[in-house]
Structure formats: C-alpha cells, structure tokens
Amino acid sequence: MLLVSRNICRIKGNTIDWRNLKKDLSMTWIILK
C-alpha cells in the first residue's frame, strides 16, 4: 500500500521515473502475492 501511494504521488507530480516506477510496481506485486 505504501509503495502504491508513493507511485500515485509520483504520477500526480508529473515527475515519473519509469525505471523506479516499474521497480516499485514489481515490489508491490510481490508483496501482494
């Protein structure tokens, strides 16, 4: 949840670092599994 919130903040800030975003999403997926 924390990682997801951070991703949303990053997207809303329009300063997306795609590599970090992808890494965060991967970590979130692992945690959710």
UniProtKB/Swiss-Prot annotation:
Keywords for the protein's UniProt record, in alphabetical order: Cytoplasm, Nucleus
Annotated localization: Cytoplasm; Nucleus
Superkingdom of the source species: Eukaryota
Predominant subcellular localization, coarse grouping: cytoplasm
Keyword Cytoplasm included in the entry's annotation: yes
GO CC aspect terms: cytosol; nucleus
Keyword Cytoplasm attached: yes
Protein name: Uncharacterized protein C8E11.06
Organism: Schizosaccharomyces pombe (strain 972 / ATCC 24843) (Fission yeast)
